[in-house]
Amino acid sequence: MSGRVAVVTGASAGLGAQTARQLAAHGATVVLACRSIEKGEAVAAGIRAQVPGAQLPVLRMDLASLASVREAAARLHDGFGRIDVLINNAGTLTRVRSVSVDGFETTFATNHLGHFALTGLVLDLLAPAGRVVSVSSRASGYRSTTVELADLGFEHREYKPMHVYGQSKLANLLFIFELQRQLAGAGTTLVAAAAYPGVATSDFNRNLGPTARLLSHPALRPLSRLVTQTTEMGSLPSLRAATDPGVRGGEYFGPTGRTKGYPVLHEPSPLARDPELAARLWEESERMTGVHYRFRP
């Protein structure tokens, strides 16, 4: 990764911070894109303590604000001639329905719309042999998970946090697979792939539900080790998708087990591979964000 530029969203904690650490350790310049400059700088300082001389610029970006995403994209254009790797890692889960500054349901705005907009706005910066990686979740394949285009904001459905989160993570996969189809159609060699971390012992996973919270209790750590893994291990699927020279567009990586293990190829739910749904979501995402993709061969 020496000499390459990577952008990691949500790099101020958990899997994002660990992903940035590993990329920096292998010589990449890593842009830490996060809401809090202070938290980002703290992560950068911690990485530099382990990787002296690491190049870790911190970029403020609130994915729930399209204006913030546009400003961050403009700063990337000003500061870098190219981006080799974009890892759309950041994610949130809100327990009570709220809306973003743009009026969209917060989880969907952050997890999907912000990343859709960012990727489109920096597409011209991405190197021909570059990678775009979407970090999804096992929740994308739950039986209850759907993408309801007529009600993406859960205004007319019961607001169940895991259903809301699952929809946003399924949207991540629909987006990245449709992106790969459009890249291939344009004749570009840029690769779009996806990953999920399993169940990593990060602060975020403790918010996913009662089971995850229970497994995070100190008294149950010996039991939790049977089904969870460290953030170091949880970052490996994303890192493989971003750096393995053998990765092909549209591939999806996750742990060997359902929740833990080294990264291997997985097949997502059939819904995630639905090209018609993906195309309709793409059209709706362009309408909601005002970002229209322009592909170059």
Predicted regions and their residues:
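C-terminal amphipathic/interface module of NAD(P)-dependent oxidoreductases
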Residues: 269-297
